[in-house]
Amino acid sequence: MAKEELLELDGIVDEVLPDSKYRVTLENGVVVGAYASGRMRKNHIRILAGDRVTLELSVYDLTKGRINFRHKDANSPRPPRSGQPRR
């Protein structure tokens, strides 16, 4: 058994907040605060308002979550392209 059971829920990013935080509305209508997982930060995955994401929520605090996947949708907004390539 895992140290802590996590709930996986889908939602849509409503707002991008300072310090890599996000406000996400879950499928059931609940609004939670979230942050990007370390794997997403390491791989420079951008999360924009309107993106569909998968969250992990702890059973102990259902107001905070960790974004661990950004779904690719045809109608989701695209990040702006910068002129310089990544190193």
Curated annotation (Swiss-Prot):
Q: Print the keywords alphabetically.
A: Cytoplasm, Initiation factor, Protein biosynthesis, RNA-binding, rRNA-binding
PROSITE patterns, alphabetically? S1_IF1_TYPE
- Show the GO MF annotations: ribosome binding; rRNA binding; translation initiation factor activity
Do you know which Gene3D superfamilies this protein is assigned to? Nucleic acid-binding proteins
Q: Into which family does the record put it?
A: Belongs to the IF-1 family.
Q: Give yes or no: UniProt keyword RNA-binding.
A: yes
Q: Does the keyword Disulfide bond apply?
A: no
Instruction: List, alphabetically, the Pfam families matched.
Output: eIF-1a (PF01176)
Bias class Pro residues marks the residues at 77-87
PANTHER family from the UniProt entry: TRANSLATION INITIATION FACTOR IF-1, CHLOROPLASTIC
Q: Quaternary form?
A: Component of the 30S ribosomal translation pre-initiation complex which assembles on the 30S ribosome in the order IF-2 and IF-3, IF-1 and N-formylmethionyl-tRNA(fMet); mRNA recruitment can occur at any time during PIC assembly.
Organism of origin is: Burkholderia cenocepacia (strain HI2424)
Residues covered by the S1-like domain = 1-72
Principal place where this protein is found? Answer: cytoplasm
- Annotated region Disordered: where? 68-87
Q: What does this protein do?
A: One of the essential components for the initiation of protein synthesis. Stabilizes the binding of IF-2 and IF-3 on the 30S subunit to which N-formylmethionyl-tRNA(fMet) subsequently binds. Helps modulate mRNA selection, yielding the 30S pre-initiation complex (PIC). Upon addition of the 50S ribosomal subunit IF-1, IF-2 and IF-3 are released leaving the mature 70S translation initiation complex.
GO cellular-component term (any): cytosol
Give coiled-coil spans as residue ranges: none
Q: What is this protein called?
A: Translation initiation factor IF-1 2
